[in-house]
Amino acid sequence: LDVGIVPRFIDDVFRRKAQIEKERPGCEIVIHVSFLEIYGESVRDLLDMDQSINKEIIIRSDPSGNVLISGQKMPQVATAEELQEILDNGSLYRTTGETSMNAFSSRSHAIFTVYIDQEFPSPDACDDSSSSDLRQSKFHFVDLAGSERLTRTHAEGRLQHEGIDINKGLLVLGKVIRALGDEKLKGR
């Protein structure tokens, strides 16, 4: 069975978690997850099962330049199966539309984030057993809405406008990525 990068990542994270906790007694590894959808101008929490209430997700930066997101659910997960189930269930809430090319065409971008906190007993703490080192990691998996040729999708009305907006957004994103990789623009 050929699985994608996210299921392989999930299996690898929990395999490594078990290995580290076995090799480093006292190490604690905690894993949380979030799943956001960007549709048009709005951000939606795909892990919030009560979709009838429009909860506001607030995205801002702190003075250090870190992106902070408030209002989203971030459940803790204990197993690879639990994490995969959360991803699968959240994916069911993605905004889709039917075109002649795809019955479930994604109309949004999605960001699936896995947060890993590793706490190791500090080797410098001779007598203080409460001292520890904390290592935090974040892995973002981004699924972009695909570009569409209107002549092939035969989209009309709302779906046509969404397709045009998706294509414009992907064009701008492509320009940003090229600019980030352009050596002549480094430092600007």
Regions found by a protein language model. Give the residues of each.
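P-loop NTPase motor catalytic core
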Residues: 1-188
